[in-house]
Curated annotation (Swiss-Prot):
The keyword Metal-binding applies. Pathway: Amino-acid biosynthesis; L-isoleucine biosynthesis; L-isoleucine from 2-oxobutanoate: step 2/4; Amino-acid biosynthesis; L-valine biosynthesis; L-valine from pyruvate: step 2/4. PANTHER family: KETOL-ACID REDUCTOISOMERASE, MITOCHONDRIAL. The active site is at H109. One of its GO terms (cellular component) is cytosol. This is Ketol-acid reductoisomerase (NADP(+)). NCBIfam families: ilvC, PRK05479.1. InterPro entries: 6-PGluconate_DH-like_C_sf, KARI, KARI_C, KARI_N, KARI_prok, NAD(P)-bd_dom_sf. It comes from Rhodococcus opacus (strain B4).
Length: 337
């Protein structure tokens, strides 16, 4: 099914310019949205809790900062860009008591609305504007006069103005320059979670670790295994990112291409596909979200345990040693502190 696309000429910037926008959070997306909204002539304020390390940064960049409650009371469009696991409590404690008839509540990801962790009053417009790129790229493209494609969705539209408002917001952060895709909260949430879990984060991570283990257990040096299954992954992903799988296969050697065709289906087979379907079913049913919420309610104990086990994998020890040799690699804070 073809998606519905919108561009700059389909969006009226004056709509969002006539509103007061509160952006809750000042992380990767928060700073990109806020600065680009401001540069597009929108009256914007940032909502951050007292003591947040981001307050000084936002103020240094010329933005007005208040608590989430203060800016929610002031605004008539509230964009929630805090972490997923913090949004429900922020909504209950700071946003909901300050909602007024005609307000719009926007999100950068649909999880809390789709799985009803947040239930907005019926008089509030509920929508989503979600650039398909990290915040630094969204901001850089905006400054360069370009844009990152964005998604919009409307979940609740009591005034019949939701789509026009979302398109106006998307235009203000540069999304309509590249193209805006209309979707739903359900589609965005479930596809995003599946991609993260089955392929981008969970699937790729386990594939890399297992490949490393197979090579080391067969007697190869950990350093050689690291280079072959992790370090060179970026080269392949960059080719796929630039021109799809066909571009990657065109660019690698015939030996690599032929071997990939033969061995890839032996690694990712029909059984893998069935397990992926089971992951998708857990997402669709809300089982994953229930487990996510339970983890937060239990003080992140499950997540911390998983993090610890992952950090202790031998590939991490080998990787840190090899990255010390790579002057061109940006080192993470955890390795440079």
């Amino acid at each position: 099914m073809a998606v519905e696309m919108f561009y700059d000429d389909d969006a009226d910037l004056s709509i969002i310019q006539g509103r007061k926008v509160a952006v809750i959070g000042y992380g990767s997306q928060g700073h990109a949205h806020s600065l680009s909204l401001r540069d597009s002539g929108v009256d914007v304020r940032i909502g951050l809790k007292e003591g947040s390390k981001s307050r000084a940064k936002a103020e240094e960049q010329g933005l007005t900062v208040g608590t989430p409650a203060e800016v929610s009371e002031w605004a008539d469009v509230i964009m929630v860009l805090a972490p997923d696991t913090a949004q429900a409590s922020i909504f209950t404690n700071d946003i909901e008591p300050n909602l007024k008839d005609g307000d719009a509540l926007f999100f950068g990801h649909g999880l809390n609305i789709h799985f009803e962790l947040i239930k907005a009053p019926e008089f509030v417009t509920v929508g989503m504007v979600a650039p398909k790129g990290p915040g630094h790229l969204v901001r850089r493209q905006f400054v360069d006069g370009k844009g990152v494609p964005a998604l919009i969705a409307i979940d609740q539209d009591p005034k019949g103005e939701g789509q026009a408002l979302a398109l106006s917001y998307a235009k203000a952060i540069g999304g309509a320059r590249a193209g805006v895709i209309k979707t739903t909260f359900k589609e965005e949430t479930e596809t995003d979670l599946f991609g993260e879990q089955a392929v981008l984060c969970g699937g790729t991570e386990e594939l890399v670790k297992t490949g490393f283990e197979v090579m080391v257990e067969a007697g190869y040096a950990p350093e050689m295994a690291y280079f072959e299954v992790l370090h060179e992954l970026k080269l392949i992903v960059d080719l796929m990112y630039e021109g799809g799988i066909a571009r990657m296969n065109y660019s690698v050697s015939d030996t690599a291409e032929f071997g990939g065709y033969l061995s890839g289906p032996r690694v990712i087979d029909a059984g893998t596909k069935e397990r992926m379907k089971a992951i998708l079913a857990d997402i669709q049913s809300g089982e994953f979200t229930r487990r996510l919420v339970a983890n937060v309610e239990n003080g992140n104990t499950e997540l911390e345990g998983l993090r610890k086990a992952n950090a202790e994998h031998p590939i991490e020890v080998t990787g840190k040693k090899l990255r010390d040799l790579m002057s061109w690699v940006d080192r993470p804070i955890t390795e440079t502190a």
